């Protein structure tokens, strides 16, 4: 089986569907991974790291692959050959046109954002992990924007009261 990892095209998207570590694990299972050149740049993974993990890099991750894994659905569904599978956050309940075009192109799609948030599916639950990271980042951004110390600080020279916030 060949898995393709495309470069994300959505504006501001910095995530990548597979890390070099996950790529290495797939390779040990006999799965060949093709990573589009620059796909990991936004997440600070170089092409060399993917190659060291056993992946090959190419100008496109859509050519001659059985499965495409992406964070979001590719903009150009026509890049996917009939019989290819796509695993991404497709938002099928919102983007009916995308679902229709995937079906018309003969692409089997797995919408990762519709996997139930239950214990049995926890290892595939992308929404909980992304929400957790987004919440953490929001607190960091808020702390930076506040311009005052978050924790209470006690020193010989005095005490700085903790910041108060609402999440």
Model feature map: region roles:
Residues 2, 76-164:
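Glycine/serine-rich phosphate-binding loop and adjoining beta1-alpha1 elements at the start
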Residues 1, 5-101, 105:
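An N-terminal-biased, well-structured beta-alpha scaffold segment characteristic
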């Amino acid at each position: 089986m060949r898995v393709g990892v495309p470069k994300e095209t959505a504006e501001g998207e910095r995530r990548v569907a597979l890390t070099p570590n996950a790529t290495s694990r797939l390779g040990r299972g006999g799965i060949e991974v093709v990573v589009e050149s620059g796909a990991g740049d936004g997440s600070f993974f170089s092409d060399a790291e993917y190659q060291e993990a056993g992946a090959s890099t190419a100008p496109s991750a859509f050519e001659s692959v059985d499965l495409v894994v992406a964070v979001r659905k590719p903009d150009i569904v026509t890049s996917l050959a009939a019989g290819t599978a796509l695993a991404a956050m497709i938002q099928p309940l919102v983007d009916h046109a995308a679902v229709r075009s995937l079906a018309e192109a003969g692409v089997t799609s797995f919408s990762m954002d519709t996997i139930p948030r239950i214990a049995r599916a926890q290892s595939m639950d992308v929404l909980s992990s992304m929400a957790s990271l987004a919440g953490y980042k929001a607190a960091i951004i808020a702390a930076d924007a506040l311009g005052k110390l978050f924790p209470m600080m006690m020193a010989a020279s005095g005490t700085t009261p903790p910041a108060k916030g609402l999440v």
